[in-house]
Amino acid sequence: MAKILGLSFFYHDSAAALLVDGTPIAMAEEERFTRKKNDAKFPQNAVKFVLNKANLKPEDLDYVVFYEKPFLKLERIMKTNLSIFPLAPQVFIESTKNLFLKKIWIREIIFKNVGVPPEKILFSEHHLSHAASAFFLSPYEKSAILTVDGVGEWAVTTIGVGEGNNIKILKEIRFPHSLGLLYSALTAFLGFEVNEGEYKVMGMAPYGKPKYVNEIKKMINFFDDGSYALNMDYFSFDRSLKTPYSRKFIKLLGKPRNPKSKFFTRETGWPSYFGEKPQPEEYEKTAVEQERYADIAASIQAVHEEAVIRLANYLHRLTGLDKLCLGGGVALNSVANWKIIKNTPFKEIFIQPAAGDAGGSLGAALAVNHIALGNPRNFVLKNAYYGDSYSNEEIKEFLTKKKSKFRYFENEKELIDVVAEEIADGKVIGWLHGRFEWGPRALGSRSILADPRRPEMKDLVNTKIKFREPYRPFAPSVLAERAEEIFEMPKARNHFPARFMLYVVDVKEEKKKIVPAITHVDGTARPQLVFKEESPRYYKLIEKFNDLTGVPLVLNTSFNLKGEPIVNSPADAYSTFERSGLDMLVLENYVVYKTT
């Protein structure tokens, strides 16, 4: 019975995943414990958690696997650094120093922090880790595989085939020609943080029109085999520590957006929570400026979708398969994912919820288990609940120390009745139940819940509770068997990505007025399908809300404030509750009320 620990760290979203006999036992990102968003440090807390969950000690492990090969990465960075040394000596000095001080000493760092002997420490290639995390957890015996991200060692995109317990990479695109880094450059240009703000670009895009597609296509060349190449004259990510785009990029698209600027358009109007409305001349000028940035966001999203669809269509021509597994950070672009279903011959897609670098930890463990050790597959990932959990006894002790006003429910039905009634009455609820989610989405274990029927709920949750940008959409959690009534998603229950909020689909025309709080400006939503067998308490809550309102879904957003990771513990949840406009906090069987 192989016990394998997978690790990812030192880039962003460090994580640990434990595999026992081919089955994931526990998985978590380090940020959930340190409360530092996108924490890249060695995942000491996550390692401790996953081992404790399985009652294992380091000496019980058969292997510890790192999600990429440091010396292949060293080769790429050194060759890149040497090629740009005369132009950017500071980049050469800083990145080389960073490499030699820590990033190539992975075996020693794992030995020191985990305590396993060096011969038990293995390495998987970055994109193989992504491919393994996608394919080996899927329900498919054989499928096409597409991985796309910023950069691994050399590869930025791979296409391949998975069959049984093997993966064959057929082709790859290499650095610097990265679709992920193209999207990240536009993310930075639009005033957001790279490796964190890409989903904000996706949220801003529907407010604009793709007017700048031709300009962005000057930055990328498409070829008949689905591949592409960047025009590096527009980029500086290979030679700058500060900005990923060049002066030529700015000359083409204009002044970068100020990260502190307020986003609104003439169509949306000036949101009341922005404060005093500017004078007409300033209002018009600012609106036009922000609309231009929305148009640029819409344009990069359109070009990104075209690139992914081209790759997928070529992969289908190459393999003839109708099932596709997606991996890498680009697989978190839920708008593009659904476009693959609509615009290629692929009939089914599988994506695991932590498709980015955090999930590479799990993929590395899977690659060793199935490819290196030859163990057969025996597991399909149907939910994302692999984090830590807390007992009612622990919660009672915490709340008693806090001298909080709370109520305990012995009976689950009574608890659900009360919470569903509060949501239907317009209250916004913080909800903590069971093990926290693997990946960046809140899926009913660490969620903020509200009534999707109320149009004002979108602004209320954004500004008084989440303290975040007003253009960010909210997702619905819907009873799986009722999803097709609300969304344009035929055979909804068959779509695995919808379990993990990884598809954006159209809301049916006649339903948009019924659920305005989860309907984005372009008439779409990013639903989570909730299955009774996977999330029984959450399912019952939505079921009760449906009994009260006739609407089989609730508004669900991640339980965190702007700039913070999703909550892990009752203490995290309580802190967020105290610092926000949440009306009620549910911690397992305890309901906590605001004290006046």
Residue ranges and their predicted role:
Residues R32-L56, V308:
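N-terminal phosphate-binding loop and adjacent alpha-helix
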Residues K48-D62, N113-G115, A312-T319:
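Phosphate/pyrophosphate-binding loops at sites that engage ATP/ADP/AMP, CoA/4′-phosphopantetheine
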Residues M1-L5:
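Extreme N-terminal starter segment of soluble prokaryotic enzymes
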Residues K285-L311:
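Adenine-nucleotide phosphate-binding core of ATP-dependent small-molecule kinases
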Residues F9-A26, T34-K37, I77-V91, N98, ...:
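Flexible beta->alpha loop and helix N-cap segments adjacent to enzyme active/binding sites
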Residues V47, A54-K57, D62-L87:
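Glycine-rich nucleotide/cofactor/substrate-binding loop typically near the N-terminus or early
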